[in-house]
Amino acid sequence: RDRSPSRGLGDVYKRQILLAVTAALAITGCSQNEEFEAPSQKAEINFNTAVTRATELDIDGLKSSGFQVYAYNTKAEEMSATVTLSTPWINGSATYSDSKWTVSGGPYYWPLAENLQFFAYSPKDGVTYTAPNGTTDKGYPKFTYTVGNTAALQKDLVIASVANAQKKTNEAATDVSLTFKHALTQVNIEVTKEAGYTYTISKVELTGIKGSGTFTYAGVNAGTWTAGTETSVSYAYELGAFSDDKTAVKAGNALMLIPQALTDAKISIEYTVEKDGSKIAENSKEVSLTSTAAWAFGKKILYKLTLPIGAQEVGITATVTGWDAEDPVTPTVD
């Protein structure tokens, strides 16, 4: 579609200077970071990408799923919580084909010495995006999102934003670099058993969890989550096999969940214990997570459970870090 200055771009400079966008999905801990040079100096938008999930998103996954990007022209105003966002200057789906990225509805052109505000996310499906209407609310856009019911259906939602990008008069245009960040909380569970006993674990489940929420952009590559108000849901977790009395964390099996306060959250676990081929205990236990840290945007958490043989308390620890490392949480299992 023709997006030249004669087609409603307002004060866009008549020299058709292409907007080149670099989508550098620089996800913490990702070893695949690709830099792409703009293939030409024309007006066509080009994207660069690098990624890490449902297995963690990787570069091939991003090329397959693409991403959604919005841009707003705020003229002389810089982005803030009080700025009014007009009709999107760009509202497009970025797709990868023939070794390059293109955005639907393009090409797009730089306005001279005016501020463009960029907001992007991936995957494109499952997101309901809302920009402030400029009358009853202003400032940053937001979107609602619901995670899948199982780990296999959950995707590694990532977001990016760039504030106040400009093409100055008599200066060459530079790429707009979108640095994507993980927007969910990644959750894993590890179990330690008593040595010398055989444990058969039939159920591990996170309960009292909000499955949807609203993400509001705030600043560059930042934002806040508000958990949904719907009835809490449960998510089954699949443990890895025992090795040296401890379960392994299975690759690609992490839960990707909405960041939230753990007001009613619990881990439910059912297991039997055998000794020398004879069953000696059958347990159904719950571990409260209310005293552990809230789930934060872009964090990775590991809950480490110590399961007793019988009617003793289950120990638990928890740690939280950025996406590149996994912190254990060790709560007590009653």
Protein language model features and the residues they cover:
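Sec-dependent N-terminal signal peptides
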Residues: 17-24
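Short, intrinsically disordered, charge-biased short linear motifs at domain edges
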Residues: 15-16, 43
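Contiguous ligand/interfacial binding patches
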Residues: 203-260, 272-278, 284-289
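Short, low-hydrophobicity acidic/polar segments
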Residues: 32-200, 205, 233-244, 248-251, ...
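Hydrophilic extracytoplasmic domains
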Residues: 278, 283-334
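C-terminal motif of bacterial Sec signal peptides marking the signal peptidase cleavage site
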Residues: 27-29
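Single conserved hydrophobic/aromatic residue that forms the stacking wall/gate
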Residues: 1-13
